């Protein structure tokens, strides 16, 4: 009997133990990352040929203590390598692990190689050659602290390389893991199996090979035992012949079918080629279509299983598409696959929540470095009374109602950017803005009293419903989370995409950026105020303070202003403002852009303006500003500085976003100024529900 070790992916050890025992292994002991077992020579070949789950089959050769590189050399030489190598066999050494003595794995591999070669030369035997690409023998050495474990890898290449997959195509999961996913899915061979996001077909091919009793090692052309002196070619050929016979019989007797689809035609062609090479191509129907086109291929039965490894993302801006995909899959399963089972393997358990399905079972496993989960679901049978599955119906109805009203209004006004929804329903606490053919969902961060999982699930529902109501593809939707800002406002960078979208607002063309910042470059609630500035600016010198991206300057310039002066502290936003001005044919000396602390610049400036627009922050204590600013506390002092720059008969439009702001009319009167509140005139229908989003005033000399 040989003592052996079968390695596997983390989380699959118990499954592998059961498989090895069915093959005849004895003394199976599960450890992290594999199973120790015992078996004769025939079992070695059986496990290599038939294990669908093992990554490698290892034959331990010995151990040694390593306190110096000489210890490693002598420990390796203690093994009788001349009785292990066939004459002329090539070899390669794979060394892993480090300690205080062996600090480089390449150095460790070199010492092992030297010890093996010297074992031959000392006996005056021909030295074996190293072949790193396709060796006849592969020696594995693991160094754990002071102990080196030396073994012969009888697999050669990893056992996940079945021989059917085109190596030029990357697979998101190895074949060994795919086989485990199929085994854990609850699918019964002989029943239909469907993968709606099949990629190169790995899950379906592994399932078909299992169902037709086709050994996973049948198509491999190279093994790690070809140079092993104890290799028994007779037994190996018997094992191989048995596998070939069983494969022919299994394929001839199998009657059920497999279905795979993917949106990428090139990937589907690769899947077809892989299935043909695996010998089960006739059993699988591959189609080019996305999940939105998914339908039950057997609506009249029998029931089967849907299995998949759907895509996942780590970036916030990739979530809308993925949430939409999962939500759509969940609804399609409920509407068309009643009585079927569903099994999904994912690195993102949160995304599986958007299916709106309750899992019956779940398993954990590693996919390389990723912690993954596999969840199995049973889809209830549909009846004549069953209603089609919907998502966030109250929210969807409100959004649909708002869209019907506002879309027509926006078209008549000549605007492409407007708010469609602003937390109209308390349980759906988001804002939805339309920017041309795109939409932005801003999630208001829920209070700590709200269960985070429920809030996230509700967000998934909102995304799916928004895409459905607006009829836009997922890549046209942007998701943002808006939290209470503490000292960091719209200048906070979120991304580096640099994607700008050109939109129209009345007669102006403006650039917006939906992904890189918390705000988009256009404050929608100030739309009417900007139009008013355009109407007031003909022949006037216009000053725009705290200008952001200069959209007010654009409207003033298009309204016939003699000059525009745009002041902001941010170089990024001033460059953006310049792009906006140029987009509208406004450039040259008449349109100045000044980077400065607005309050400091205001105190030192000595120019005169006919029309001034100022929309300061509610509060700021930026390090780049000389002092803190509070709009309630400091607005009179601000008006004092502005008055100095205001020509006789001039006007200041003053706006801010502080809720409950109280204008100090007496303080203004002492300065010789009067204030007229025009807030209601500046609120458009899309902000009718939120009348405190800003307040706006016209201030003139008394």
From Swiss-Prot:
Signal peptide range in chain numbering: none
Predominant location category: cytoplasm
PROSITE patterns: THUMP, UPF0020
Pfam families according to UniProt: Methyltrans_SAM, RlmL_1st, THUMP, UPF0020
SUPFAM superfamilies reported for this sequence: S-adenosyl-L-methionine-dependent methyltransferases (SSF53335)
Keywords: Cytoplasm, Methyltransferase, RNA-binding, rRNA processing, S-adenosyl-L-methionine, Transferase
Recorded GO MF terms: 23S rRNA (guanine(2445)-N(2))-methyltransferase activity; RNA binding; rRNA (guanine-N7-)-methyltransferase activity
Transcription regulation among keywords: no
Subcellular localization(s) per the UniProt record: Cytoplasm
Catalytic activity: guanosine(2445) in 23S rRNA + S-adenosyl-L-methionine = N(2)-methylguanosine(2445) in 23S rRNA + S-adenosyl-L-homocysteine + H(+); guanosine(2069) in 23S rRNA + S-adenosyl-L-methionine = N(2)-methylguanosine(2069) in 23S rRNA + S-adenosyl-L-homocysteine + H(+)
Cellular-component GO terms for this entry: cytoplasm
EC number: 2.1.1.173, 2.1.1.264
Domain THUMP: 43-154
Family statement drawn from the similarity comment of this UniProt entry: Belongs to the methyltransferase superfamily. RlmKL family.
Function in brief: Specifically methylates the guanine in position 2445 (m2G2445) and the guanine in position 2069 (m7G2069) of 23S rRNA.
Official protein name in the record: Ribosomal RNA large subunit methyltransferase K/L
Source organism of this protein record: Salmonella paratyphi B (strain ATCC BAA-1250 / SPB7)
